[in-house]
């Protein structure tokens, strides 16, 4: 069972997508949710606040989700942070690149709250 009180950071340049993910998380019982518009803003927030889990879009301006993942894995303090990458295409090359960068799991848009729950449960069973 995952900690319903864990702090979750959702990162997406599209505010509607952040709202959709936030609503899904609330539906699943998670209420401690913070948001960022891109990887650069997310990284800044991660360096200031303790976050237990990151859900990030892949394609964003300023800093992509993949670049955010690489920055997190390169930082000794942030390195252990579980990371779920959200992508529009499940291209094999992209998945391989994300796995090499240290992603815990990924989900392809569009997805349901049930799919999100399955991904979160799988990450926290690792």
Regions found by a protein language model. Name each.
Residues 22, 67, 90-105:
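Alpha4 helix (beta4-alpha4-beta5 surface) of REC/receiver domains from two-component response regulators
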Residues 35-44, 65:
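Helix N-cap/capping motif at the beta->alpha junctions
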Residues 44, 66-79:
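Short amphipathic alpha-helix used as the core "switch/output" element in two-component signaling
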Residues 49-55:
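Active-site beta3 strand of CheY-like receiver
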Residues 60:
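Receiver (REC) domain active-site loop signature in two-component systems and cognate sites
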Residues 111-120:
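C-terminal output helix
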């Amino acid at each position: 069972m995952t900690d319903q009180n864990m702090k979750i950071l959702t990162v997406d340049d599209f505010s509607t997508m952040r709202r959709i993910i936030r609503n899904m998380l609330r539906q699943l019982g998670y209420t401690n949710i913070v948001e960022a518009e891109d990887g650069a803003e997310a990284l800044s927030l991660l360096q200031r606040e303790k976050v237990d889990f990151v859900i990030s879009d892949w394609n964003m301006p300023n800093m992509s989700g993949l670049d955010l993942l690489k920055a997190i894995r390169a930082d000794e303090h942030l390195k252990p942070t579980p990371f779920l990458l959200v992508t529009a295409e499940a291209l094999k090359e992209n998945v391989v690149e994300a796995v090499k960068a240290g992603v815990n799991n990924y989900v392809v848009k569009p997805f349901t709250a049930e799919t999100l729950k399955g991904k979160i449960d799988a990450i926290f069973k690792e």
